[in-house]
Amino acid sequence: MYSFCLDNRHSKGFAYIDYSEEKAIATLYQKHNIPFIIDLWNRYYEDHIWGLEELENAQRDMMAYMSVTDYDMNSKEEREQMYLIYKLIAIVSYAIFHQRSLVGSGD
């Protein structure tokens, strides 16, 4: 599982990637060249802090993958990838909205 919080490593996480979503993130990592996903997957079992500039770039990069036309909606695996993109955009956007860095913590 991977948890996200704003700024402080010791604060309670506001969002999580659970074990059931790991397959979707691994597939996105393999299929697409999305720097935030690559960084997240490479640091999945570590703690990491993304600054505002990185988050703004991540938001822009992932927005390109939001359209349902990019996915086969008959495929459960592709729907899960799309939902994870939506979730990650929401997580990143939340941090940007609050103008705070995003701390990820793997366990």
Regions from the PLM with identified roles:
Residues 1-107:
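Acidic (Asp/Glu-rich) sequence patches and key acidic residues
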